[in-house]
From Swiss-Prot:
Cofactor(s) for this UniProt protein: Mg(2+)
Protein name per the record: Enolase
Binding residue positions for (2R)-2-phosphoglycerate: 165, 343, 372-373, 394
Keywords on record: Cytoplasm, Glycolysis, Lyase, Magnesium, Metal-binding, Secreted
GO BP terms in the entry: glycolytic process
UniProt cross-references to SMART domains, sorted A to Z: Enolase_C, Enolase_N
Gene name in the database record: eno
Amino acid sequence: MPIITDVYAREVLDSRGNPTVEVEVLTESGAFGRALVPSGASTGEYEAVELRDGDKDRYLGKGVTKAVENVNEKIAPEIVEGEFSVLDQVSIDKMMIQLDGTENKGKLGANAILGVSIAVARAAADLLGQPLYKYLGGFNGKQLPVPMMNIVNGGSHSDAPIAFQEFMILPVGADSFKESLRWGAEIFHNLAKILKKRGLETAVGDEGGFAPKFHGTEDAVDTILEAIKAVGLEPGKDVYLGFDIASSEFYENGVYDYTKFEGPEGAKRTSAEQVDYLEELVNKYPIITIEDGMDENDWDGWKQLTDRLGKKVQLVGDDLFVTNTKKLSEGIEKGIGNSILIKVNQIGTLTETFDAIQMAQKAGYTAVISHRSGETEDTTIADIAVATNAGQIKTGSLSRTDRIAKYNQLLRIEDELYETAEFDGIHSFYNLDK
């Protein structure tokens, strides 16, 4: 029977050693689902609220016992006493949103609500004897995503003196996800060799990328290109580059202040100068995607950037859209960006996540399914990427088990789909003139 009989949450740890929420759901028939909730380092101003305890004597204030209690004492009784079916995802998500009653899920916490939402979906898939991607996407879910691999970390994700938060490689020329993953791994290991030869640090950051002290942004890019060529691959054909600039992290009083991360030698740029700078980089290097190139509140700057580069570069809104259909709808209407980053914990339920993906795809925007810097062994985002035919996934570098877990899940899915599996490579960027 599909009736949910038990919902239970506990406090566990994420990849940074910080507490997070784990939720388990059980049905009458014994079907079971478990979900772990991720957490971000750089967060958008308009994201749903991640409820933390604030008790400085426990986990430095980062405990999540309040969120756990909200699941066990408030959400669980509503679900169990209401005799909800595990197959009724939309009704359960809607009930939790109403129970919270706030615009940003600040009462119960998005980390509490999301844990339940995903655990319910996993239990439903278990009940039906289906893999999660098939339960979520039906027979249409068969496209494996191009991995956006963050192999060099800067900004808030490392101590490297570089403002840009992520430098990514995208192996679009591969014939399969399996081959794209191999290319990425070989580039990653060749990059490590190059860094060691230069006497640079090869310790990895939150998302598994290297965080050496490069001589600025272009030094980082040139070194990555060297690693790509060392594998025998061609930049701009086999492999493209991407940036997550996370510009909201260094935007203040109308100025993009690179000195925050790069020291006194860093530039200070107006919105127009920021657009000019990004265009210079695009003209010089094989860049196919730029995330958060402008601040989340600099909509005029975003419009300038979109008008200038929107036909040839994927312009991804992360802090800009925060997986929120209201924000995305406004962006579509104003012609801002051409892609949305999808982070399940930015909005807090699977239903709202899928609504955002569908809205983007209907408008001709791409949807990039994404991890957070504080991750867990949970692989739900891999299944979401295939279920929605998103075509792109951003889940870190080629190290750290919390990142590799998602890649390994995608390998399993590709194997299971066998001849029906699709990998569209460069054609996943249907929002660009190629």
